[in-house]
Amino acid sequence: MNFREEAEKNEQWIIEQRRFFHQCPELSEKEVNTTKEIGKRLEEMGLEPHYYDGYTGLTADIKGGKAGAGTKTVALRADIDALPVEEHTGLEFCSRNDGVMHACGHDCHISMLLGGVKMLMDHRDKLKGNVRILFQPAEEVAMGAKYMIEHGALDGVDAIYGAHIWGGFEAPYLNFESGPRMASCDEFRIEVNGLSAHGSSPHAGVDAITTAIHIVSEAQEIVSRYNDPLNPLVVTFGTINGGQRFNIIPNKVVMTGTVRTLSSEMRKKTEEILRSIVEHVTAIHGATGSLEMKYLTSVVSNDHEDLNQIAEKAAVKLYGEGCLKHLEKMMGSEDFSFFMDEVPGIYGFLGSYDPEKGYTASNHNDCYTADEGLLKRGAAMYAQFAWDYLEEKAE
């Protein structure tokens, strides 16, 4: 089965879906109308959507006509939330919601997965297994995948496929390389407690600001001295707050930041070193301190060679040997990693950077959009991967 021609037949319908959802973006955990509209379309295809009480997002199951004993279930995922961005694309179908925009291409993901589902439903009688459809909310705040998992979205699933349209990757290439693809992202909060004093008498207090500055400085050595230089690691301080008046030494400083790495081992080690730095630097200065670490997303890593091969062969089947291209791993993060922590998964990219056609904005930019001719390519990949996976794994 080759879904290229099927995708071309459905191209206009897929584009219509993209334009509809682009005009009606909703923020993370508020995708109420988006969820409802996706559900309507799934029902029109003959599916029974499963919704979550008090939360957004939905799932549905395609039961294959040739499913038998030992049948596999493969999941296909698309994220559905938008960003708090005022759109400046100039599109005729631009956002109707002030200050909210599909600036990361999730409108494209919705339409591509709907297109993939439509094509699979047209051939359900020949499908050698089941397909779980996941329209995931709250990716931008790294909450949606975790919620869906906790409420059974992966129950009975043997593997999962996801992909992202990407402004930093040349159109119309695809990428399904093995190994780490996107970094883990963790948030930290450091509190330094000293002793307040008058600015004229620093010896009478314990300067929380000076202590905090030393912690920031020492933390940079985690990257330069404790980490293998061939392993990307970023330790970033995003906020530092302390003091209320120019002539008073404050007794407290609070700092927050993020740690990003492509190594699960270094992820754990960084927390240990940062905790040690806080403990020892505050002790040297006569202060006290604490570190709170909030684990957000794991490393997105394509570690299952069978899935990598199925995805790459599917791409070549659809668009020929030249459709795949190298893409450097990146330090951005994705909560698709939560799904990969639970079941074998593959995560790919579809390039949208095309300066000749004027598509140069990156994801999260207020001018980000993509050539709609790419949508059928993403839709075909959803359907082709599911079909080929079930064909290969059929017992």
What feature does the model see in each segment?
Residues V117-H123, H151, G286, M340-E342:
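Alpha-helix C-terminal capping segments
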Residues F21, A60, L76, H106, ...:
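Divalent metal-coordination and catalytic microenvironments
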Residues A75-R77, P84, F188-I190, Y347-S352:
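Non-cysteine beta-strand/loop elements that form the S-adenosyl-L-methionine
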Residues T59, L83-V85, T89-M101, C108, ...:
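Histidine/acidic-residue-rich, glycine-tolerant segments that coordinate divalent metal ions
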Residues I213-E395:
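Metal-dependent amide/peptide-bond hydrolase catalytic core
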Residues M1-H102, L114, K118-L127:
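Acidic/His- and Gly-rich active-site-bordering loop/insert found
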Residues E26, D79-D81, A138, W166, ...:
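Active-site beta-loop-alpha junctions enriched in small/polar residues
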